Amino acid sequence: MHLPSSSSLYSSPTKSLFAMFLKARALSVTTQNPPDLFSLLHHSPNAKHLRHLHAHLLRTFLYSNVVLSSKLVLAYSKLNHLFPTSLSVFWHMPYRNIFSWNIIIGEFSRSGFASKSIDLFLRMWRESCVRPDDFTLPLILRACSASREAKSGDLIHVLCLKLGFSSSLFVSSALVIMYVDMGKLLHARKLFDDMPVRDSVLYTAMFGGYVQQGEAMLGLAMFREMGYSGFALDSVVMVSLLMACGQLGALKHGKSVHGWCIRRCSCLGLNLGNAITDMYVKCSILDYAHTVFVNMSRRDVISWSSLILGYGLDGDVVMSFKLFDEMLKEGIEPNAVTFLGVLSACAHGGLVEKSWLYFRLMQEYNIVPELKHYASVADCMSRAGLLEEAEKFLEDMPVKPDEAVMGAVLSGCKVYGNVEVGERVARELIQLKPRKASYYVTLAGLYSAAGRFDEAESLRQWMKEKQISKVPGCSSI
């Protein structure tokens, strides 16, 4: 039988094995445990050759060999035939053990079908006599992390305890990482503290989890504990440490971490470069951020967006727009953060038409505006004194405006003394946040500025009766 050349797909030993297999098949030679089949399946032959192997297994009844059949499932998955081919092979296996279940559950999890992976696990638990081992549970916990299915994660946790896997380092580590990924840091910390042995992966996960949730101080405490335990620091830890420094505005510490990275790393990778740039942006040291950005060997949308947002929030309209245009010229598509940067720049510059241009451009990139994008546009219109238009913009929003969006319009009303719009927006905000004194104070100020002193005094009296008071400011003098 003539087969197309596969020199680009196979090493010489594998090609020889397949030639031997074809010759043996032609002579109807069969064994119960042919090593060539294991080797061919392991090396993931192309789809055509794999179908030959599949047919041979069926014809010679070697399909009943659970290891061979499981390897066949894995081989199809490696060729991106996970669904439906791998799954079909799996369900047609005459016998399935934990090895075969682990393969199908793991492959669905690794291929991005987390929910399907969870469904398979639950089916194994309910419909078969097979019970999970300490390889199955980390696989399924990883799937729960990816799918953010908290209910499934809690259920698997209960099963882990019920089956006696609480002492397994593999399972406990997977549980900690799952809860970190879901943002349930109290659960993760309790498990972490109860573990007799902890490795650098766990410390890094906890540290990163705290920083991702904005708990920079708790993250730094975990970092110190990690250092006291003698674990080596790597680039993953440094990324989280830089994020913590950025959140706290700890420029001095951020510079120290930057120096450590330069001394230890011959070339800053993309993630480290992005983290250093973002740290300087959050500390409002944009010259340093730009220098790091320019010297990066590779930049992605995160690199560009971080700097564009920094200049936008700083009010540097020219630089924000310039970087946006350069990014598009390099063929990098903007994301939601990129547009937030240029919209913030528009708001600072009072560029209403430009803000509408960028806001509409989001649709061309299939980016659904978030509330913060609406807030930036509303802020831009309000700063320009277009308060009736801004109010209409709020009314036409496809989602209910939040405090930031309405607050931007109310601030504009305060600047321009627009009592009519300000009164309507303030009442919406008071309904949303009835205990927030600043909205009452702003509305009372609008009444007073318009000469409506009785209404202003009535509102202040009502605040006293409801015990709504503004938190007094502090002075260091």
Swiss-Prot record:
GO MF: RNA binding
Keywords: Repeat
PROSITE patterns: PPR
Region (Type E motif): 405-477
GO aspect biological process, one term: RNA modification
Placement of PPR repeats on the sequence: 65-96, 97-131, 133-167, 168-198, 199-233, 234-264, 269-299, 300-334, 335-369, 370-400
Record bears the keyword Repeat: yes
Signal peptide range in chain numbering: none
Pfam families registered for this protein in UniProt: E_motif (PF20431), PPR (PF01535), PPR_2 (PF13041)
Domain of life: Eukaryota
InterPro entries documented for this protein: E_motif, Pentatricopeptide_rpt, PPR_At4g14850-like_plant, TPR-like_helical_dom_sf
UniProt keyword Repeat present: yes
Similarity comment text for this entry: Belongs to the PPR family. PCMP-E subfamily.
Alphabetical list of PANTHER family matching this protein: OS07G0636900 PROTEIN, PENTATRICOPEPTIDE REPEAT-CONTAINING PROTEIN
Protein name according to UniProt: Pentatricopeptide repeat-containing protein At4g14170
Gene transcribed to yield this protein: PCMP-E17
